[in-house]
Amino acid sequence: MMTAIAPSQSGQRLALLIQYQGTHFHGWQRQVGQRTVQEVIEQAIASVVNHPVSVVAAGRTDTGVHAAGQVAHVTVNSPIPVHRWPGILNARLPADVVIRAAAAVPPDWHARFSALWRRYRYTLYTDPCPNIFLRPWTWHYYYAPLDVAKMAAVLQPLVGRHHLSAFHRSGSNRAHSWVEVQAVSCQRRGALVEIEVQASGFLYGMMRLLVGLLVQVGQGQRSPASFTEIWQQEQRHLVKYAAPPSGLCLLGVGYPESPFPLALCTEAMPQFQLASVCPELSIA
């Protein structure tokens, strides 16, 4: 944890730990005429400090993507004690955005560029019976049984530093497709399949394209060798389907000295333990 930082005459930089349900947002980044997470948070802060602010996030999540542990920074000219900011902002924010915590950080601390890693989780709900409570948070995938062990095995070679242009959607201004993948996992918990990737950064659309291709391996439509060849040979044209955004969540962001305990991020995620509720219909 960081030591306390005194505010300067030019303002105090705050780190914010943010949770949001992305269903009704057009992503994080401010867009003219669209409802975005960045805009609603900036409006809430500006209404308190009476000056415009810019809130910078560690990861710019796409339309419909959720966050349990998004981290952002903002510089404010205000005498408000740091510990009061979450309560003040939550009273002004819509119900689908929550400030979980705030911390004072040095003036040069940057939510995006100071980060060492980001961790995303993609969740599939595989029972044939729909679940209204899981619908906003998962991809309801019940069309074919998934070989989760095969999916987990084919993910492992991704660990390391690789060109991952096969999982890079068009529309990004990023100059390269190098990604350092630090950890991967794929596991089943009852009717849920959870895919997690931790990396130094993520390409535009990377997780959803990766999951879309991985599911093809799990259902037997594509071989493990084909999956590996596609990303190693950068065959972007063969990655034709992106998984829906509803199943994707930014779990957390890591820093050399984190302003927040990681537990604050992970505890915010609902932990569903679901067995099949329609065994007579189950195809798994």
From Swiss-Prot:
GO molecular function: RNA binding; tRNA pseudouridine(38-40) synthase activity
UniProt keywords, alphabetically: Isomerase, tRNA processing
Record field: catalytic activity: uridine(38/39/40) in tRNA = pseudouridine(38/39/40) in tRNA
HAMAP family registered for this protein in UniProt: TruA (MF_00171)
Binding site for substrate: 120
Record NCBIfam families: hisT_truA
Residues of the active site: 62
Superkingdom classification of source: Bacteria
EC number: 5.4.99.12
Function: Formation of pseudouridine at positions 38, 39 and 40 in the anticodon stem and loop of transfer RNAs.
Catalytic EC class: isomerase
Protein name (Swiss-Prot/TrEMBL): tRNA pseudouridine synthase A
Pfam families per the UniProt record, alphabetical: PseudoU_synth_1
One of the protein's GO biological processes: tRNA pseudouridine synthesis
Coiled coil: none
Subunit structure: Homodimer.
Family: Belongs to the tRNA pseudouridine synthase TruA family.
